């Protein structure tokens, strides 16, 4: 398949690498040239400007936030330059409002749009073990399945309205952040009673909370290791704000999301923004006087 790819951050570069490894023709663009050079060495073609990648059958993008998506796709003319009939798979965690806006913008230009946010960190992406939540035209999703099957281990369709996939992703990330926060507070409580964090978390993640997220982040909290960051606290704040905006639009109270937002803001204000978002546990320990 002829694929354009925009966004070569931690996730994007490994996903693009998998597509190249699967034999697809991939043309890449990224603001930072170093990531482009890395992919060219693996067989990708470098695009001089973002609009050049839109002359393809499929376009895959994974950018940091709504502003980056609008800047590249609208301001830099990617949508207007796209080949008619192109199908765009947007893997990014963007707002529900932007998903609605972009679905309409693609329809207006006779382009397909699939909201396809992913669950998983860069190591899972490198192994093709992401879970992909997809929403959009069923025919477009079927056509894109050869790409989706390279990127992830399972595709979860959630209907034809693009914004639904992003609502699922945002809600899921809220749940992960909530799990990290509760583990951090529980560890602070048990540490205050003389219990080793690793011992406590080993019990809980082997019994009541044996899910992968608890094991992964529990291990990070026990080891107090928040670098390298698979997902930063700054990105965590971005996603909690997306959850609150989506909730506000439908009058859904989310009091714990508001508390998480404030905690992430405090972390960032005190220099922890580029640490893994599991560093929420550090804030809980600090407030308990356990520095």
PLM segments and residue spans:
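Rossmann-fold dinucleotide-binding core
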Residues: 74, 92-174
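NAD(P)+-binding Rossmann beta1-loop-alpha1 motif at the extreme N-terminus of oxidoreductases
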Residues: 1-62, 81, 86, 122, ...
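Hydrophobic beta-strand scaffold residues
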Residues: 26, 46, 112-114, 155, ...
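Helical "substrate-binding/catalytic lid" subdomain
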Residues: 162-288
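Rossmann-fold NAD(P) dinucleotide-binding segment
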Residues: 50-111
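Hydrophobic residues within alpha-helices
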Residues: 15-16, 35, 102, 147, ...
């Amino acid at each position: 398949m002829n694929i354009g790819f925009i966004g070569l951050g931690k996730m994007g570069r490994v996903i693009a690498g998998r597509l190249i490894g699967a034999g697809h023709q991939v043309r890449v663009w990224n603001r930072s040239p170093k990531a482009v050079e890395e992919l060219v060495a693996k067989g990708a073609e470098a695009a001089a400007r973002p609009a050049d990648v839109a002359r393809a059958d499929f376009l895959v993008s994974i950018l940091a936030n709504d502003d980056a998506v609008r800047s590249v796709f609208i301001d830099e003319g990617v949508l207007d330059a796209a080949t008619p009939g192109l199908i765009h798979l947007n893997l990014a965690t963007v707002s529900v409002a932007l998903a609605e806006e972009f679905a309409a913008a693609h329809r207006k230009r006779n382009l397909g749009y699939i909201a396809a946010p992913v669950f998983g960190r860069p190591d899972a992406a490198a192994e093709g073990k992401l879970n992909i939540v997809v929403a959009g035209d069923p025919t477009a999703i079927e056509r894109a399945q050869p790409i989706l099957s390279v990127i992830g281990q399972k595709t979860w369709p959630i209907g034809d309205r693009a914004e639904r996939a992003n609502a699922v992703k945002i809600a899921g990330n809220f749940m992960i952040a909530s799990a990290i926060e509760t583990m951090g507070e529980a560890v602070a409580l048990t540490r205050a009673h003389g219990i080793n964090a690793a011992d406590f978390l080993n019990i809980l993640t082997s019994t009541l909370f044996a899910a992968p997220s608890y094991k992964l982040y529990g291990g990070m909290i026990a080891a107090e290791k928040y670098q390298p960051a698979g997902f930063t606290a700054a990105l965590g704040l971005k996603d909690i704000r997306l959850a609150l905006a989506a909730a506000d639009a439908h009058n859904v109270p989310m009091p714990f999301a508001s508390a998480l937002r404030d905690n992430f803001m405090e972390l960032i204000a005190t220099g922890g923004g580029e640490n893994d978002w599991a560093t929420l546990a550090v804030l809980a320990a600090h407030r308990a006087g356990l520095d």
